[in-house]
Amino acid sequence: MTSEEDRRDFDALLARVPLPDRAKSELSAMMESDERHYHGVGHLALLWRRHRLYAAAEGLSAPEIETLIACAIAYHDCVYERGRRDNEERSAEVWLRASAAAPLSEEDRNWVADTIRATADHLAYPNPAADAPLRERARAWVLDLDLTPLGEADADFDRNTELLRLEVPHLTDAQYDAGRLAFLRRLSDAPLVYRTPTLAAQFEAQARANFARQLVGD
C-alpha cells in the first residue's frame, strides 16, 4: 500500500514531467500494478525525494536538467515483466511514444531514453570526470539514485530484499539467492558503487556493509 508521503512525492515527480495527464495516468496505472512490490510508486517517490535533497550539491537542480532527470526517474521502471531481459529497452520505448508530442527536443527525449536504457547495467556507465558535461553527470546521477536503496540501514535493506523476492515468484529460493548474491558480489567488487560524490558520501559505506553482511560465507 502506498504511503501518503510516497503518494505526495510521486505526484510531485509527475508534476515535473511535461507530458499530458493521460500519459501520466497510464504511467501511474503501470506503477501501481499488484505485481509490483519494490519497483512501484514508492521506489520512484524515494528517488525523487533523494534527488531533491542532494541534487543542489552536485549542481543538478536547475530547472532544465531537473525536468530531464524527473522524466528518467518516472519512466525507468515503467515496464517490469518478470523473466524478461529487455525491460529497460521496452521502458525507453514507452517513454519515446508517450513523449512524442511533448515540448521537448529530440535530443532531450533521446537523452531520457538512453538514460533509461543505461539502468540495465548501472556499473557499465563510465565514471564521469568532475568537469564532464552536465548531461553526462546527470545520467550518472540517475543511475546512482537508483542504487541508493542498497545503502539503506540493515532493516530497510532486508525489507527491500523481501519485496524484490515477491516480484519473482517464478524463481525458486535457490535461483533467487544465486542471482541476488551474484549481483551483490559484482557491486562489492566494483571500485565504487556510486560515481557522484554526494551520494557516495551518503550511501557507499552502508551499501558495502550490506554487501559484506549478505556475502558472508558465500
Regions found by a protein language model. Give the residues of each.
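Secondary-structure capping and boundary motifs in well-ordered enzyme cores
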Residues: H39, P63-T67, D108
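Short alpha-helical hairpin
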Residues: L13-M30, H43
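His-Asp-centered metal-binding catalytic motifs of divalent-metal-dependent phosphohydrolases/nucleases
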Residues: L47, E66-R82, S91, V112-A120
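An amphipathic alpha-helix signature
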Residues: R7, D11, K24-S25, W48, ...
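Histidine- and acidic-residue-rich, metal-dependent catalytic cores
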Residues: S91-P126
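Active-site metal-coordination segments of metallo-dependent hydrolases
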Residues: D34-L46, Y80-R90
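Divalent metal-dependent phosphate-bond-processing catalytic cores, especially two-metal-ion Mg2+/Mn2+ enzymes
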Residues: M1-L13, E32-H39, R49-S61, Y75, ...
